[in-house]
Amino acid sequence: MFSFNLLTQYIIMRSLKKFFVKTYGCQMNELDSEIMIGQLENRGLTRSHDENDADLLIFNTCSIRDLAERKVMGKLGKLGLTKQSQAIIGVTGCMANAKKDSLFQKLPHIDFVLGTNNIHDLNHVLDEVLASGKQSIRTDDHFEFELDYLNAKREDQIKAYVSIIRGCDKFCTYCVVPYTRGSEVSRAPENILEECRHLVNQGYKEITLLGQNVNSYGKDKLEWKCLFHDLLYQLDKIPGLERVRFMTSHPVDISKELMEAIRDLKTLCEFVHFPLQAGSNRVLKKMHRIYTVEQYLEKVQMLKEIVPNVALGTDIIVGFPTETEEEFQETYRLLKEIEYSVAFLFSYSPRKGTPAMRWRDDVPEEVKQDRLQRLLQLQDTIYMKHRQAFLGQTVEVLVERRNFKDDRLVKGRTRCWKNVLFTGGDELVGTMQQVKIHGYSHQTLLGDLQ
């Protein structure tokens, strides 16, 4: 750790004036970026949304799929051709953990690499780089919830993300998360409740609880006697909190107690992201998903019985190594049967460091893309069916903002995660409104204020 006198500290603070942050990937990365932005603004720096106008550039990266990595590497490579001598470039996020110091070999112009478990070290790393002129790297494996979340610079004024658990212990064979974010670490419930109360006092209406597997919350700290559903009951008592969401769930860990909480708690939205990944038992076993199709469907049936109006989301991967056409058809039939409200569909790409990387990627790319397109087309018909079912219904909408394309309209979401547009002004932003649906456009419902 460096020790600086007052003159050196003054030089360091004068060395950086504006910063730029680009975020790739999931909601966890978005929250991590908000925390880093808060640190930098507390340091006295000004945020710029133009990378050419900043002398500190931070790229918060994603490794979950090959395309995400290639986008980042392409962007960072171009910066090496144009970088000014004063600019400092940092790489944070999952790529930092996955590639570590090899990033310096491929991209010698970057100045620091900061892992997902080290974002609280951002200012210390900047001080080291500025004082020494040398590259710096921190990519610890273990995470402690010691970050000052209360000083995070939120991107939204209505909705906020709150981290409750980090890491994952499931080790699906295709997934880098256990290697980039470490093992599961739950955050103390009193700290979560404190942050949520703080956000509500600032005017936030909706909180989304984040974790790679929120259903594992508290299982690593049984002495707390606070599992995920227990936490939700405590959050429901916070005055002024209108809505609570959560993501993501692992099918193995979702409990009857959680389903009953969704049914009973006024704040908890009736939407569950419930990743299937594949509709073939053999493929699921090869993925190490630790459930069968039959067990998955049992959970879906139980959830729909307890919460009849629940909306389900999912993730599905096509073209996993050795997947046959018949096994793909099993996935296709399940997608058609369950009729997800939201589906994120992907073709498989090998990720370095995962067990699946050792297997031959034997499904040709054109076959992967054909299967993906067939699922996308099916899901489009399901989306159409869902949208038509809303016609004539009156739904509760949390108004989030003016519509970007037509400022005569405002945009909000229903409790089940549907986008809604209707006529209104700034006075409606942040309020709950009843809206009658009369039409739809692509993924958006259209309505009239009641």
Curated annotation (Swiss-Prot):
Any coiled-coil regions, as ranges: none
Transmembrane segments: none
Domain TRAM: 388-450
Record GO cellular component, one term: cytosol
Species in which this protein is naturally found: Protochlamydia amoebophila (strain UWE25)
Subunit annotation: Monomer.
UniProt cross-references to SMART domains, sorted A to Z: Elp3
PROSITE patterns to which the protein is assigned, alphabetical: MTTASE_N, MTTASE_RADICAL, RADICAL_SAM, TRAM
Entry protein name: tRNA-2-methylthio-N(6)-dimethylallyladenosine synthase
Enzyme Commission code: 2.8.4.3
